[in-house]
Curated annotation (Swiss-Prot):
One of its GO terms (cellular component) is mitochondrial intermembrane space. This is 3,4-dihydroxy-2-butanone 4-phosphate synthase. The gene is RIB3. InterPro entries: DHBP_synth_RibB-like_a/b_dom, DHBP_synthase_RibB. The record marks 131, 169 as: Essential for catalytic activity. The lineage of its organism: Eukaryota, Fungi, Dikarya, Ascomycota, Saccharomycotina. It comes from Saccharomyces cerevisiae (strain ATCC 204508 / S288c).
Length: 208
């Protein structure tokens, strides 16, 4: 059913997407995830086309602190985020300041994500608010919190890339825009040659 984690990591290292499923008792959704470091305009367009269009950029707390990206509710700690059903740590949204226009195009959003992963970026590199939503990952990764946010950052770390990912929730191409569940994600992955993994199996891999 799922691609072995080591094979998925090798795929991810090549600047390619991986589909990550969470637990059926949690969101029961698949996220399309790639590394932000080298995300292309074409990849961003593919992500927007097949997802809800709400593109997020999971990152470590260290990077979020360096870039001065506070949580949407000032002073709210990760553990106290009761306003989001699954405790997702949303920060203020951003656009990269140089080289973009409105910030919403695939070109502009890919530039913003690459800038978030660029170690030379500073708080002044970004306009706030913008069209990319950074997410703060739990420091312990999926071993602390079984979320897509943490899975994205863990995949980047395991691949030797900057720990900033790009994620979007996969949706079906139907009139209601329903969320893709496991069977849908399996079919989508097979059609597009994208590995499918689960957060639980990623956690077990990290425990080894």
């Amino acid at each position: 059913m799922f691609t072995p984690i080591d094979q998925a990591i090798e795929h991810f290292k090549q600047n390619k997407f991986v589909i990550v499923m969470d637990d059926a008792g949690r969101e029961n959704e698949g996220d399309l995830i790639c590394a932000a470091e080298n995300v292309s305009t074409e990849q961003m367009a593919f992500l927007v086309r097949h997802s809800s269009g709400y593109v997020c950029a999971p990152m470590t707390n260290a990077i979020a602190d360096k870039l001065d990206l506070p949580l949407l509710r000032t002073g709210m700690k990760f553990e106290s985020n009761d306003d989001d059903r699954h405790g997702t740590a949303y920060t203020i949204t951003v656009d990269v300041a140089q080289g973009t226009t409105t910030g919403i195009s695939a070109h502009d959003r890919s530039m913003t994500c690459r800038a978030l992963a660029d170690s030379s970026s500073t708080p002044k590199s970004f306009l706030k608010p913008g069209h990319i939503c950074p997410l703060r990952a739990a420091d312990g990764g999926v071993l602390q919190r079984r979320g897509h946010t943490e899975a994205g950052v863990d995949l980047c770390k395991l691949s030797g890339l900057s720990p900033v990912a790009v994620i979007g929730e996969l949706v079906n191409d139907d009139e209601q825009g329903t969320m893709m569940r496991l069977n849908d994600c399996q079919a989508f992955g097979k059609k597009h040659g994208i590995p499918l993994i689960s957060i639980e199996e990623l956690a077990q891999y990290l425990k080894k």
